[in-house]
Every structure is written in C-alpha cells, then in structure tokens.
C-alpha cells in the first residue's frame, strides 16, 4: 500500500472528514427531495423531472464561478463559508414542515440554495485534494471517493428513516453535518491561488495590466477545455452518460421502487445504500491497484457492463436480483467516475485545474437535472422501466466513441514512468 508522510496523513484526515460530513449532508438532501416529491407530495413523473431541472440548472452558473474562485482565492476559506451557509436551507425547510407549510416551491427553493453552494465549492474541494495528496493523486482520489461513498450511505439511510425519526429531526441532522464539517476544515493549510496563476507585483508600474475579469477567466477556462481534445471528450462523454444514467437513477428508480415494487422511503434508501456500497467496494478495491497505467481502458470497458445492469432492472427481476443490480450499478459508477476524474485531474495544467474541474463537474451536474426532465416525460408516456432503455444505448455509444474516435483508450497515466506491462 502507498504510504504518505505523516503531515500529509493529517491533512488527508482533515480533508476526508470534512468531505464525508459534506457528502452525508448532501445525500440526505438528495433522497429527501426525491421522496418528498414522489412519496409525500405525490407528484407526477413530469413534475418530479421539472423540479429536478429547476433545482439543478441554476447552479450551473455558480459552478463556473466556483472554478474561477478556486483558482484565485484560499480554497479552505471558500469551503468553510460554504459549509456554514449550507446550514440554513435545511433549517428553513424544517421550519416549513413544523408550521405545516411543506410544498413543492419551498422544497425547490431550499434545495436550489443548497445546490448553488455545492456548485460554488466543488471546484475548490477538488483542487485542494491535489495539494494535500503529496504526489499520490490517484490514491487520494480513490480514497476520498470511497470515504464519500460511506458517508453517502449513512446519510441516505438516515434520510430513509424519516417515518421512524421524523422529517424535522432528519433536517436538523443535515444542518449539523454541514456545521461540524466546517470545524474540521480549519485543520487544513490555507491554499492560495494556483502556483501558475499570475500574482500581483508590488514593485510593478501603476500602468500594469489589470487582473482579468471573471467573465474572461471563465471564457479562458471554457476555451482551454474545448481546445484540449482529451479533456473535451471526457467532459462530453460524462455529460452524455450522466444525462441518461444519473437521470434514470434520480427519476426512474424512485418510481420503479414506488410503483413496480410498491416500496416506501425506507426501501428507496436501502436500495440507494446498496448502490453506494457497490461504489465503496469499487473505490477501496481500486486502492490496491493504484496507480493505474491505463485508466481510460477501464473506463470504457465498464461502459459495456452497465448495459447488462440496466437490462436486468428493465426485465423487472425479483427483489433479490434488484439488490444485486443496484450494487453492481454502484460498482460501475464508482469505477467510471473515479477513472474519468483521475484522467481530468492528471491532464489539467495547474493554472487551469480548478476551471477544468468546474467544467467537468458542470457537465455531470447539468446532465442529471436535464436527463431527469426528459426521462420524467418518458416515464409519463412509456412507463418507469422503459426509461432505462436510453441509458443502455448511451453506454454502447460511449464505448464506441471512446474506442474509435478519442484518445481515451490509448491514454496512459503520466505518474507511471515504467513501461506498460501490456
């Protein structure tokens, strides 16, 4: 196993603890939003898809802004502020529940604010990991993703217990996760702007050129991503995948649980926990093999295996096989997400890393609500199970493009200097 220096171990501990608390709080929100819409407010598939779109899309602007800020300011300070501000939306929603004022619009507004804060802070969170990883980026990414999966499982299971614990109490726990996470962030070293980014010179002439505007900085990041074909391919393929696959998980699975299997919030939570358990196994299993020489090949091969998972669920299997399918879907997601993130963070130039990560995360986050809207319409017209068919076709197309039209299959990790054993 790779061993990190002691001071790096401590920094990783602070980072992963705060990251785990953030993921626990955010996973509580994700399941609560879905089940409140489907199981409590009894909304139609089209309304659920539209609500997910309204919650997710406005956060896209903040994602690009977060990438700019992540390259310019102390990322630790930005994360602390995001944690503290994230305490507020669950408290507002808890008050609405207590006053018997829970409705679609108050749910959308509070979830939207939480999503905006997540979008603004995510690029800085990813960039800080590069700093604390101490040259073991693949290992650190896999470890943090695995720990995040554990936290997500715990948060999801807590959210699924609203009938036993109470909705207000669960929302208070969500706020506590964000608040305690801010405390652990204090242990991180301050992280200033990118080392390759221009810094002000006190001895420079007063006629020196001003700092680029936020707009021009965002534009530079988008242009950098577009002209970098491998980065463009990874961002585009992940968007395409998330549109149909993450969208299906967000909208189709809750309706499949509710209508096909006559389940409740606890069953949805347990299925989600099994999903993230599969992701957990994937990420901690990857630690044994890190660093990988050819992450792109792993990424593409797993696209084909996802087709089998979606087909199994579409076939309307017994509950036992549904558990198995959910676990392998999570395993698949854990590997593909980690591999794509590894490649993006390895190929990014330091001065553009936060902005490239913001574009990458933007693709993932924008695809899910858009896919939710489209697949909500598909469910309304063709049924819950048929919303899985587009994901099967998309996975086949991703493999074909990545193998034939992109350098993803040939990509080799720069962290390995030894010849490829293959």
Show the residue positions of the predicted features.
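Transmembrane alpha-helix termini and helix-breaking/packing motifs in multi-pass membrane transporters
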Residues: 34-40, 93-99, 154-174, 254, ...
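Small-residue hotspots at the loop-to-helix junctions and early N-terminal turns
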Residues: 29, 42-52, 142, 265-272, ...
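Juxtamembrane intracellular "pre-TM" segments in multi-pass secondary transporters
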Residues: 1-12, 191-236
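Helix-loop junctions on the cytosolic side of multi-pass membrane transporters
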Residues: 127, 131, 175-204, 403-417
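Hydrophobic alpha-helix/TM-entry signal in multi-pass membrane transporters
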Residues: 11-19, 48, 79, 107, ...
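Substrate-agnostic recognition of the 12-TM MFS/MFS-like secondary transporter fold
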Residues: 14-30, 54-68, 74-89, 106-163, ...
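C-terminal transmembrane bundle of multi-pass solute transporters/carriers
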Residues: 60-65, 72, 76-78, 82, ...
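A single, central transmembrane helix in multi-pass transporters
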Residues: 20, 28, 167-172, 217-283
């Amino acid at each position: 196993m790779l061993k990190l220096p002691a001071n790096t171990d401590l920094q990783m501990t602070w980072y992963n603890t705060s990251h785990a608390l953030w993921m626990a709080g955010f996973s509580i929100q994700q399941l609560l939003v879905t089940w409140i819409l489907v199981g409590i407010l009894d909304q139609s598939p089209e309304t659920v898809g539209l609500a997910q779109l309204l919650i997710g899309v406005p956060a896209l602007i903040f994602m690009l802004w977060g990438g700019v800020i992540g390259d310019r300011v102390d990322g630790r300070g930005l994360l602390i502020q995001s944690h503290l501000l994230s305490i507020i939306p669950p408290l507002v929603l808890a008050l609405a529940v207590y006053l018997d004022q829970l409705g679609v619009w108050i749910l959308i507004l509070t979830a939207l604010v939480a999503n905006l804060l997540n979008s603004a802070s995510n690029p800085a969170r990813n960039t800080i990991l590069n700093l604390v990883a101490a040259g073991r980026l693949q290992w650190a990414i896999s470890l943090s993703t695995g720990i995040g999966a554990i936290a997500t499982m715990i948060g999801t299971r807590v959210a699924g217990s609203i009938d036993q614990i109470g909705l207000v109490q669960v929302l208070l726990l969500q706020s506590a996760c964000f608040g305690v996470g801010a405390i652990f962030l204090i242990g991180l070293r301050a992280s200033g702007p990118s080392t390759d980014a221009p810094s002000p010179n006190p001895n420079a002439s007063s006629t020196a050129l001003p700092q680029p505007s936020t707009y021009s900085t965002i534009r530079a990041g988008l242009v950098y991503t577009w002209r970098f074909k491998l980065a463009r391919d990874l961002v585009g393929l992940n968007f395409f995948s998330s549109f149909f696959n993450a969208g299906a998980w967000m909208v189709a699975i809750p309706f499949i649980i509710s209508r096909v299997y006559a389940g409740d919030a606890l069953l949805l939570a347990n299925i989600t926990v099994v999903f993230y358990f599969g992701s957990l196994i994937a990420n901690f299993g990857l630690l044994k093999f890190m660093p990988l020489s050819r992450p792109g090949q792993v990424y593409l091969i797993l696209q084909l295996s996802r087709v089998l998972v979606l087909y199994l669920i579409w076939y309307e299997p017994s509950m036992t096989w549904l558990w198995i399918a959910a676990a392998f879907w999570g395993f698949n997601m854990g590997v593909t997400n980690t591999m794509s993130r590894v490649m993006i963070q390895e190929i990014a130039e330091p001065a553009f890393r936060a902005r490239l990560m913001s574009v990458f995360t933007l693709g993932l986050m924008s695809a899910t609500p858009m896919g939710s809207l489209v697949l909500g319409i598909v469910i309304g017209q063709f049924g819950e199970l048929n919303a899985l068919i587009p994901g099967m076709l998309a996975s086949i197309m991703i493999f074909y493009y990545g193998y034939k039209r992109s350098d993803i299959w040939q990509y080799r990790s720069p962290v390995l200097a030894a010849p490829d054993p293959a």
